[in-house]
Structures are given as C-alpha cells and as structure tokens.
C-alpha cells in the first residue's frame, strides 16, 4: 500500500476519472469506444501480465527506455511512472486520455499547461500496427474516437 501512495505522489499520470471531471464530452466518447475495455481484452486472452501487451493496453507502462528511433509519441512516456499492476494502479488500466495526450499531472496542477499537440494518426499507429492491428484504418477508426 505504501508503494501505491508513493507512486501516486510521484506519477505524472492521473487517470481518466480525473480527466472526466472537466472533459465530460470527451469521456462520453471514450466510454463508448473499445479503448475503455482494452485491459479486459488482455484478461480474456490471459495476456494481462505480458509487457508487450501492457505497453498499449494501460496508461504509462514503460519498464524500459525508449530507443532513439522511437517516435515522440512513445518517448513522452520515457522515465515516467505509470501502470504497475491491477492491484496497485487500477485507475491506469485500459487505453485512456493519457495514452494519446500524454501525462496530465501538470495540466491538473495548472490548467494553463496544455497537453502536447500530436498528429492523431502518428499516435494511433504506435499501437495499431502490424500483427497487433492488421485491419486498422486510421480514417475509419478515428471517427469513432474523435473528440
């Protein structure tokens, strides 16, 4: 339990419930998306302990350093402390606001600090690529989560 308190204090990730307080319309769109149940997908496949799967299905899971060739969308998480486990950080399960918009702790502390602007297509393909998402078409799926 102490680890959780320390982690929460130091983590730049706040979770979607905090975002929802000020961004209810975006949250409503998210709740209808498959992103909102991404962790359950892993549990159903018994992959909820696989680091390669967790990297995209939870917020801020990055037990390794981003490579120099990684995109800015991936490198924004480098050195950040996000999801640890279902027991310790349940508020960071699923694909949430901070997966795409980056850590929001600074924004929560000061609303003048805005999340970094990113090209949505480049952020999406960090997870939706290759064998992980062979049928992914940005234009088709963007319409389902656009907010």
Regions found by a protein language model. Give the residues of each.
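Short sequence/structural segments immediately N-terminal
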Residues: 1-147
């Amino acid at each position: 339990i102490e680890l959780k308190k320390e982690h929460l204090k130091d983590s730049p990730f706040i979770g979607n419930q905090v975002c929802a307080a000020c961004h209810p319309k975006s949250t409503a769109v998210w709740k209808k998306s498959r992103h909102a149940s991404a962790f359950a997908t892993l549990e159903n496949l018994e992959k909820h302990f696989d680091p390669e799967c967790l990297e995209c299905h939870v917020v801020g899971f990055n037990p390794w350093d981003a490579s120099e060739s990684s995109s800015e969308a991936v490198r924004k998480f480098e050195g950040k402390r996000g999801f640890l486990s279902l027991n310790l950080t349940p508020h960071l399960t699923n694909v949430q606001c901070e997966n795409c918009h980056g850590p929001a702790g600074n924004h929560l502390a000061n609303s003048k600090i805005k999340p970094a602007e990113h090209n949505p297509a480049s952020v999406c393909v960090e997870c939706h690529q290759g064998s992980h998402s062979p049928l992914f078409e940005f234009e088709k799926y963007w319409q389902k989560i656009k907010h």
